[in-house]
Amino acid sequence: MRMTVRRYRRRRTGSDSLGSTHSPFALPFFDRLEYLSQSINQTRKTDAPFIILVTQDNYFRSGFLSGQSPLSNCCDYSTLDAALSDLNHWPSSRLVVDIESRASPLIDLLDQLRRHSLFAPYLTPYLLVRADDYDARLFCKAAGPFHVLERQLTALGMQQTLLEAPAPAGNRKEWFSRDEWPILQALSQGRSLRQIAQLQNRPYSRIIYRLSCILAKLGLNHRHELLHLLNNLSDFTY
């Protein structure tokens, strides 16, 4: 009986997130060892790349590859799917996603990152956003546990930031919840709030409540401001 109670308590105190019972934003023990070993001598390239870069901007990509180590120790990809596939082999590498040169709407890209960040393998990617793109920076910070960096950072500033690997700003209460995110996706597709209520089989009042939570997290006052923001984020350059 004592053993049964102990096991039950262990289950109760474990994480209620899918996948792992460890802290979702802490690197596993062996990944931390690899991270420390790579930081001892960054002038010597390692088998695992320091950066996994996702961008379609050839000029931006060449800036990393032709730079100094450790930034030049980089594997570059044009799509997020390919990068996530190879990241399984190098869990200690930093995933850096260039938001500016995306080939799809930002909300679609963030949806994919959310599924890999809020659940196993609990990634904490770095998102590069233009300094003057206030809408994208605001939305990315509220979308999940992401490091949002200015795209115009110097090489030294970028290196220091990636080496420090700080905890993501904010907490779960400041990110869009699993009930709010589908509403944002539907709004970005041009659906009305009543249509969303019908699709989700929920009372209209609940959709209005979730909308008010979304507006509060983005610091907006009216849903027209939200629709304008979503319209801006739907544009892509490649």
Predicted regions and their residues:
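Residues within the DNA-recognition helix of helix-turn-helix
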Residues: 161, 210-213
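Residue-level recognition of oxygen-bearing side chains
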Residues: 82, 192, 225
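Short glycine/serine/threonine/alanine-rich loop segments
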Residues: 10, 202, 220
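Basic, Lys/Arg-enriched C-terminal extension of HTH/homeodomain DNA-binding domains
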Residues: 215-238
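N-terminal regulatory/sensing modules of transcriptional regulators
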Residues: 1-166
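Helix-turn-helix DNA-binding segment
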Residues: 169-209, 231
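Long amphipathic alpha-helical scaffold regions
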Residues: 92, 179, 220-221
